[in-house]
């Protein structure tokens, strides 16, 4: 009725089709999460603590505290493994941002870290192809993050925040982030709006983002309480879990 009163028509069929697609995507996402968190008890039962140090260093010598192969916890193995370290500089996939890549140096050889993700209890797991080299729990590796990869991903992550602000300026404060995907190559930003953006609106958004990039704003990082972060204007992403202390990035 509101649309009709303002001279608009609503494509009910199209809306229902898109709604069903979104429901399917949500179901698939929940299914993938359940396969990690529920179906694999090996991951669920792994409780050893692992510390993330990747905000202060991108290189760390560390002890292997967990090994998984084909979903099973093992004491030693070769080939494609999920490796958990006592301390790691590798950022795990979270909030739509891709996990770090890089290398592990072990017994004088370099092995590719293909991806980094979180296990159910919060430890960062590294997907590493050790090929024919066997590695054991309690062995020591040198973990080195690919700095170019981290920089490219972090730049695209910063761009999502600039885009969020630009959209709110152009379209209105009703715009809320509903998700994102941030990789080395590009970014995707999901948000709500009443209709498709016009060419004029898109150009305005692009200009605001590009102008902000050209100004080269200083990026400041602080750790504060979740409550204080919200008072400072931080926007919590729906569906994300936050601790009592959060890392607040200001540009």
What feature does the model see in each segment?
Residues 1-251:
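A glycine- and charged-residue-rich anion-binding loop/surface
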């Amino acid at each position: 009725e509101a649309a009709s009163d303002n001279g608009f028509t609503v494509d009910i069929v199209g809306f229902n089709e898109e709604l069903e697609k979104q429901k399917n995507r949500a179901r698939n996402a929940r299914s993938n999460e359940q396969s990690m968190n529920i179906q694999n008890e090996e991951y669920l039962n792994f409780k050893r603590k692992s510390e993330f140090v990747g905000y202060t260093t991108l290189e760390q010598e560390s002890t292997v505290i967990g090994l998984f192969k084909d979903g099973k916890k093992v004491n030693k193995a070769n080939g494609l493994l999920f490796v958990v370290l006592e301390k790691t500089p590798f950022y795990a996939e979270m909030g739509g941002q891709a996990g770090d890549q890089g290398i592990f140096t072990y017994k004088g050889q370099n092995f590719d870290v293909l991806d980094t993700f979180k296990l159910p209890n919060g430890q960062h797991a590294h997907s590493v192809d050790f090929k024919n080299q066997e590695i054991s729990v309690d062995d020591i590796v040198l973990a080195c993050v690919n700095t170019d990869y981290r920089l490219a991903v972090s730049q695209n992550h910063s761009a999502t925040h600039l885009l969020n602000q630009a959209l709110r300026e152009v379209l209105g404060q009703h715009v809320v982030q509903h998700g994102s995907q941030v990789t080395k190559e590009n970014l995707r930003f999901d948000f709500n709006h009443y209709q498709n953006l016009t060419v004029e609106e898109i150009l305005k958004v692009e200009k605001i983002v590009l102008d902000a990039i050209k100004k080269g704003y200083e990026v400041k990082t602080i750790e504060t309480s979740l409550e204080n972060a919200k008072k400072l204007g931080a926007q919590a992403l729906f569906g994300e879990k936050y601790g009592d202390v959060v890392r607040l990035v200001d540009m």
